Amino acid sequence: RFMGIPGENLNGVMSSNEYLTRVNLMDATNAASDTPVLYGKNVLVIGGGNTAMDAVRTAKRLGAEHAIIVYRRSEDEMPARHEEVEHAKAEGIEFMTLHNPIEYHADENGRVKEAVLQVMTLGEPDESGRRSPVPVEGKTITMPADMVVVAVGVSPNPIIPKSVAGLEVSRKGTIVVDDSMRSSLPILYAGGDIVRGGATVTLARADGRKAAAAMHEALSSK
């Protein structure tokens, strides 16, 4: 998801989902492809989770001179696995913690050229148990950036919940399921991120196997 700040609609600013999907599944690193991905020399990846690490390491491997993680908390509060952070550092990834973007500026062609970052400090712990990020009043910096990948979290695609009558969803928009991954509609099973929110491929596969077993049992009993 995006952060709702000025400049997020500029060329060169994209979500981690779009970036990684295009690079890994759509041959976007091929300049002759239908939708080639933009290459950046100064790439900022916003976020501190595993997806952010995937995106920033991808940018570095694609030739970025500076591939930088921008995270609003300290490194200790990063949700990414420790080994992911260490692997990123080993590849030359730079980390700018306690900073948060508040605006992006464009060049004359409408492509992002720089990011305005708010300097942050840490306050009291929030509901996640991590210390909450607090803006330092009057302190910002401007950094060059010809590409920005936003990896601050995911939200469920609203199309399915809104288009399927009678489907129970949580207040966060995820599909509510029972232990067999069956939804409020007996013919519909769900798993992965649409149930859990942002999670891992491993958990999604496990959900799929559980749902498949439940579907097989339901069909076999008829």
Model-derived features with residue positions:
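A conserved FAD-binding loop/helix module that cradles the flavin
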Residues: A55, I194-K222
